[in-house]
């Protein structure tokens, strides 16, 4: 089995329980995180085109199709966010709600442009997802990481995720190579409870 590139893609599941907005955030390194707007279709299409074809193997949606991205914008999905550096799309994260017996969970998809990897943008977007989950009353976040993506694995574990399982040969790339899939989880309701206990009375 070949080794997948670090920082390519992570998938997580979460479930929003209450409504909420996704405010713009800016870091000291001038990375802006915000929800998608109509003007982002072209830039986001170019962003996904910049991701190596081999990396896109792990995507669940046809991100090479501008109509797919236009569809995201058309429904005003505030759970699809981008990271901007000097007005260039550096990263993308999506938080998607599950259905049926998984309606209490959801899915997070994270992609960082090759030239911006290793700069902490992935961590910033992952942290944003956890914060949004707390705001939405999510009970549990589950992250899927392809085995061998050590930097991604380390990033999520530092954010409080723990490995729950390993699915053997669960992912196959365009070359037919199979990879194990690691399942990590984070009980964000417990985090919210601890923050509530630690917060001083007004």
Residues covered by each model-derived region:
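Conserved GNAT acetyl-CoA-binding A-motif
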Residues: 133-145
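Conserved acetyl-CoA-binding loop-helix of GNAT-fold acetyltransferases
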Residues: 118-131, 135, 154-158
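Conserved beta-strand-loop-alpha-helix junction that forms the acyl-donor binding cleft
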Residues: 117, 143-153
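C-terminal "cap" of GNAT-fold acetyltransferases
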Residues: 169-202
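A short beta-loop-alpha structural element at the N-terminal edge
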Residues: 31-44, 187
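Glycine-rich phosphate/pyrophosphate-binding loop shared by adenosine-nucleotide-utilizing enzymes
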Residues: 29-31, 86-92, 179
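Conserved catalytic-core motifs of GNAT/GCN5-like acyltransferases
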Residues: 142-145, 157, 162-179
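Acetyl-CoA-dependent GNAT
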Residues: 38, 50, 54-115, 126, ...
């Amino acid at each position: 089995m070949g080794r997948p590139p670090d920082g390519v893609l992570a998938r997580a599941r979460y479930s929003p329980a209450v409504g909420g907005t996704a405010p713009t955030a800016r870091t000291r390194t001038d990375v802006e995180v915000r929800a998608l707007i109509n003007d982002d279709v072209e830039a986001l299409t170019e962003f996904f085109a910049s991701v190596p074809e081999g990396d896109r193997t792990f995507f669940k949606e046809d991100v090479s199709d501008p109509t797919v991205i236009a569809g995201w914008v058309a429904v005003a999905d505030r759970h699809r966010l981008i990271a901007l550096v000097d007005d260039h799309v550096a990263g993308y994260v999506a938080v998607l709600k599950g259905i049926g017996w998984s309606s209490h969970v959801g899915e997070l998809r994270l992609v960082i442009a090759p030239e911006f990897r290793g700069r902490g943008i992935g961590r910033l977007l992952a942290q944003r997802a956890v914060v949004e989950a707390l705001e939405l009353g999510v009970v549990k976040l589950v992250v899927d990481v392809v085995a061998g993506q050590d930097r991604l694995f380390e990033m999520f574990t530092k954010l409080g995720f723990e490995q729950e399982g390993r699915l053997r040969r669960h992912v196959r790339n365009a070359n037919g190579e199979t990879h194990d899939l690691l399942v990590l989880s984070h009980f964000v309701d417990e985090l919210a409870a601890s923050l509530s206990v630690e917060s001083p009375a007004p």
